[in-house]
Each structure stands twice: as structure tokens, then as C-alpha cells.
């Protein structure tokens, strides 16, 4: 399988064309196939997002305590966390987050629902310093093989279909 390796520093990330995101959204989805090397308790590792300006899609793995992991999503000034994940460092996984226009954020890990948050204000895209793979207000430390951003909230069935389509490529 092909993938990019990131060192957890500000020197390794992948840029995107920010203008491609400046469209009308009927929801948002970020889906990433990744392998995390390490994260300290209390730290965030950014899978996709921005490091300056408005957060439109910032998606992270957060470790509230040693060996415990959650997906964190931050957009439009609001944010939330998934339930705890069965994540093992140095093993591939697929994380996904959807947000609908009503403010419902749903979290998925390896195709399975792992929590929701309500009341997260939905915003259309706001210009910022750019959208990046492995860079937000912190950095990814590990590998990323797939990063997909959608202009709508995928359904649970669509998340499962996408997960099923890529899982064997990364030995999940």
C-alpha cells in the first residue's frame, strides 16, 4: 500500500489547494486511513485541518490519558470528542467524522460508529491559511494513506462502504 510518513513536526505535511474547498456544503465528512506512531497523554495529533484562521475540518486523534484515544473534530469554533477508541499505535485504522447542517457530528472508527455530538454549529467554508494533511495546530506522527474530504455528510452505510473498500489495502 502507498502512504506518506510524517514526523510529527511542522516540516512534514501535505498542502492542498484551498480554493477547491471554497464551495457550498450540505454537510462535511473527513475520512482518513492512518497509522499513528505515538502520542503523549493530553496531546492531539492532527490528521487534517488548518493551523491558521477558521477551522473548517480539523480532525485529530486525542489522547486524554496514556493508552486512551478519541477522535476530536473542530469546525467553526465548536468541537467535540468521540467515545474511546480501540486504537493500537503502529497499526492501521480508518477514522471518519461527519457533520450535518443541523449540527450533528458523528464519529466512526474502522467503519463502526463511536459516538456523536449535537449542537455543533455548522458553517460554510471560511477562508484561512490553507487546508493540510497532517498539519493543524499540531502535527501527525505516523503514516497517512488515504485522506478524503466530502462536501456532504456521508451516511453510516457510505462510511462502511468506504472502509470496506480500503481496509484490505492497509491490513485492517
Predicted segments — roles?
Residues 5, 49, 131-134, 143, ...:
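Hydrophobic alpha-helical membrane-association signature
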Residues 74-76, 125-145, 149:
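Extracellular glycan-interaction patches encoded by glycine-rich segments
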Residues 46:
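An anion-binding catalytic pocket shared by soluble metabolic enzymes
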Residues 28-38, 94, 98, 110, ...:
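Extracellular, beta-strand-rich glycan-interacting domains
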Residues 1-26, 129, 164:
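Low-complexity, glycine/proline/serine-rich flexible segments
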Residues 17-19, 82-83, 95, 135:
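Generic recognition of flexible, low-complexity loop/linker segments
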Residues 1-10, 31-41, 51, 55-121, ...:
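Extracellular glycan-interaction surfaces
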Amino acid at each position: 500500500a502507498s502512504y506518506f510518513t510524517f514526523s510529527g513536526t511542522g516540516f512534514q505535511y501535505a498542502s492542498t489547494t484551498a480554493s477547491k474547498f471554497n464551495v457550498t456544503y450540505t454537510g462535511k465528512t473527513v475520512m482518513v486511513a492512518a497509522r499513528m506512531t505515538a502520542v503523549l497523554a493530553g496531546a492531539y495529533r492532527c490528521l487534517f485541518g488548518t493551523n491558521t484562521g477558521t477551522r473548517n475540518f480539523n480532525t485529530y486523534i486525542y489522547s486524554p490519558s496514556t493508552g486512551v484515544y478519541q477522535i476530536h473534530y473542530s469546525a467553526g469554533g465548536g468541537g467535540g470528542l468521540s467515545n474511546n477508541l480501540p486504537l493500537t499505535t503502529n497499526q492501521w485504522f480508518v477514522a471518519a467524522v461527519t457533520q450535518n447542517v443541523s449540527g450533528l457530528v458523528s464519529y466512526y472508527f474502522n467503519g463502526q460508529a463511536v459516538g456523536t455530538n449535537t449542537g455543533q454549529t455548522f458553517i460554510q467554508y471560511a477562508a484561512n491559511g490553507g487546508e493540510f494533511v497532517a498539519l493543524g495546530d499540531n502535527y501527525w506522527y505516523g503514516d497517512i494513506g488515504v485522506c478524503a474530504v466530502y462536501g456532504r455528510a456521508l451516511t453510516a452505510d457510505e462510511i462502511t462502504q468506504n472502509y470496506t473498500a480500503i481496509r484490505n489495502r492497509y491490513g485492517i
